[in-house]
């Protein structure tokens, strides 16, 4: 897992996208133009959660190391130390993949 000095705020989650397969099971190479935008990522860092109306933090549903599925067009792309990351809000995360 990447070691980054980025600390997400509130209910934001920093993820690194899991690259999609470049070949099919039968060995055919998938060209870049035919690939769909990936929606699976590994959680790198998690914010402390949003503040609720009663001044308590709303706990986060994900933790570092989780593999998640996120909304196709959610988040903000960023580069840090030559690596590409995506900064999502917790609402952009649709599911946790249990392994």
From Swiss-Prot:
Belongs to the GroES chaperonin family. SMART domains: Cpn10. Heptamer of 7 subunits arranged in a ring. Interacts with the chaperonin GroEL. It is found in: Cytoplasm. Its main location: cytoplasm. The keyword Methyltransferase does not apply. Together with the chaperonin GroEL, plays an essential role in assisting protein folding. The GroEL-GroES system forms a nano-cage that allows encapsulation of the non-native substrate proteins and provides a physical environment optimized to promote and accelerate protein folding. GroES binds to the apical surface of the GroEL ring, thereby capping the opening of the GroEL channel. GO terms for biological process: chaperone cofactor-dependent protein refolding. This is Co-chaperonin GroES.
